[in-house]
Structure formats: structure tokens, C-alpha cells
């Protein structure tokens, strides 16, 4: 089902392995057409169905644009680029070499994700001739409208939040959005940088935004949202810091968070293998940041 957010912004539920409300894919339709996020390689057929449901052909796609290149966001980038011969992919400069030569990217993903990486599937390389490197502030004209790159590291060093007028495609820079709970929780992998994550949230907060478009999952009204996001990140880091100082395990710390945040434990089981232990992984990412600070 295609959701029409506005005259130019559309989105659909990718449903990887049948999991609903896990990955949103967005499309901007102007004189040029931009596809924002592709999902993993294993969901390429679902992505093609979504594009077809939009009434578009693969030749209509001009730009394929990830917020960052984690497998659940852009593992299928090379697969769809092989089919969209008129398209160019727009990526962070730090992602450029990884998407043109995927072996390091793939091996790093397998090391971090284990079996989930295999479920997502191996990415395919994209020729450098079809890549655009987007520095901070880079603007891409789509005709009557444009997208601007706001570098938002923290979750990943190669993360971009794409600004579209008073809307932002936030990827994972503002956590995971659970509309049923009206809250976003952090998602902080092993190389998480808490200082940069908070700076990125502040950069987004300085803009007069009306909507945040989450990959996980769906649009969120921006009013008050980033204040909630920053407060939640700070609460989690405070809880993790207390646990770190007491030499608690990551499992013990996540249980404290489950007790402190209504609905949090249930979200850990809401998307099968895709979501399992996500919050434990976030605690471990925060612990790793604290350890690096102390090193």
C-alpha cells in the first residue's frame, strides 16, 4: 500500500521477510524522482513491487539515496541500481569507497550482525561513475524542490539526514520511532559516538521542521519530537553510565531500562529476528563509547 504524505512525498512499508512496520521506503516525485532508502538486498522484490505500485518504471528513478549504508537501509542499493540504469546513488563521502567495493562493508556487517547479515543478503557494488559524494550542505535539485545533506554522525560516521523543505528523512539519527508508544528509543551500534549523536540532534533541532520521516518507522510530527529524542538518549546514557560504574553487565542494564520504560521490552520482540536484542545492542554500543572515553 502506497501512503501519500504530500503531493510529492510518498512512502510504503517494505515488509522484509513479511515483518510489518519495520522499514519505510520513501519516494519524492518532482521533475526528478528520488528513492530514499532501499532496505536490504533480500527485500529487493518487495522494493520493486512498491515502485510499480507507485505507477513508476525503473527508468523513472533518477536518484537512489540512503541515509547511511547499514544493510537494513542500503544493502539493496547495488541491486536496485543494476536495474535503474538512469539513476545515480548519492552517498556520504565516508561511504563512497564501501559501496563501490563492497567486501570490507560486507565483512564488517557480518562481523557485527552475524546471521542477520546473511538474512539481509550481500550488497552489490555500484560503479564510481554512478556515485555522487554528498558533503555536508550538498544540495540536489529535483526540479521545483531540492534535498540538502545534513551530516548527522553518532549512529554511524557516514550518516546523512536529508532535508526536504520543512521535512527531514532522519534514518537512525533520531532513534527508532514507535508510533503506538508515541516515543523514540535510541539505536546505538558498537561504534556509537554519544557526543556526536547529541550534536546531530541539536543540528536537526535548529531547523524549523514539521515532519521527521523515520526509516524505522514512518512519518512523525516534528513538534516536540527532537526534545523527546534528546531526553531519551540522555536518560539511556545516564542509566548505562550508572551501570558501567557499578560494573553491571549489558544484560543487567537493559533489564533496568525495560523496567523504567513502559513498552520497551515488547518492542524488542515486535519484529522477529530483525529486532531481537536491538536494545541490548544499543546498551553495548553506549558501553563501548564509555570504555573508549576511559581508555
Question: Across the structure, where does each feature detected by a protein language model lie?
Answer:
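Conserved beta-strand hairpin/beta-sheet module of binuclear metal-dependent hydrolase folds
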Residues: 1-54, 162-172
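Metal-dependent catalytic neighborhoods of phosphoester/phosphodiester hydrolases
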Residues: 74-84, 101-102, 223
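Divalent metal-coordination and catalytic microenvironments
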Residues: 8, 28, 37, 47, ...
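Internal alpha/beta domain cores that form substrate/cofactor-binding pockets in large enzymes
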Residues: 191-199, 203-204, 212, 220-251, ...
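C-terminal regulatory/interaction regions
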Residues: 242-295
Amino acid at each position: 500500500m502506497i501512503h501519500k504524505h504530500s503531493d510529492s512525498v510518498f512512502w510504503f512499508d517494505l515488509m522484509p521477510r513479511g515483518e510489518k512496520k519495520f522499514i519505510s521506503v520513501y519516494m519524492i516525485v518532482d521533475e526528478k524522482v528520488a528513492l530514499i532508502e532501499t532496505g536490504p538486498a533480500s527485500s529487493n522484490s518487495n522494493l520493486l513491487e512498491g515502485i510499480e505500485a507507485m505507477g513508476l518504471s525503473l527508468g523513472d528513478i533518477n536518484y537512489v539515496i540512503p541515509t547511511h549504508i547499514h544493510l537494513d537501509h542500503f544493502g539493496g542499493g547495488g541491486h536496485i541500481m543494476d536495474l535503474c540504469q538512469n539513476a545515480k546513488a548519492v552517498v556520504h563521502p565516508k561511504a563512497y569507497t564501501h559501496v563501490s567495493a563492497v567486501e570490507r562493508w560486507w565483512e564488517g556487517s557480518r562481523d557485527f550482525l552475524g546471521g542477520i547479515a546473511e538474512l539481509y543478503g550481500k550488497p552489490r557494488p555500484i560503479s564510481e561513475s554512478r556515485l555522487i559524494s554528498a558533503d555536508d550542505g550538498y544540495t540536489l535539485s529535483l526540479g521545483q524542490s531540492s534535498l540538502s545533506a545534513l551530516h548527522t554522525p553518532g549512529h554511524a560516521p557516514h550518516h546523512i539526514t536529508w532535508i526536504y523543505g520543512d521535512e527531514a528523512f532522519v534514518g537512525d539519527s533520531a532513534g527508532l520511532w514507535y508510533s503506538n508508544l508515541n516515543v523514540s528509543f535510541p539505536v546505538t551500534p558498537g561504534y556509537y559516538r554519544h557526543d556526536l549523536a547529541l550534536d546531530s540532534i541539536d543540528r536537526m533541532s535548529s531547523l524549523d521542521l514539521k515532519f521527521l520521516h523515520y526509516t524505522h518507522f514512518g512519518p512523525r510530527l516534528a513538534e516536540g519530537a527532537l526534545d523527546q529524542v534528546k531526553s531519551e538518549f540522555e536518560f539511556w546514557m545516564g542509566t548505562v553510565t550508572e551501570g558501567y560504574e557499578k560494573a553491571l553487565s549489558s544484560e543487567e542494564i537493559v533489564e533496568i531500562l525495560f523496567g523504567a520504560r513502559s513498552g520497551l521490552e515488547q518492542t524488542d520482540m515486535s519484529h522477529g529476528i530483525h529486532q531481537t536484542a536491538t536494545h541490548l545492542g544499543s546498551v553495548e554500543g553506549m558501553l563501548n563509547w564509555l570504555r573508549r572515553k576511559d581508555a
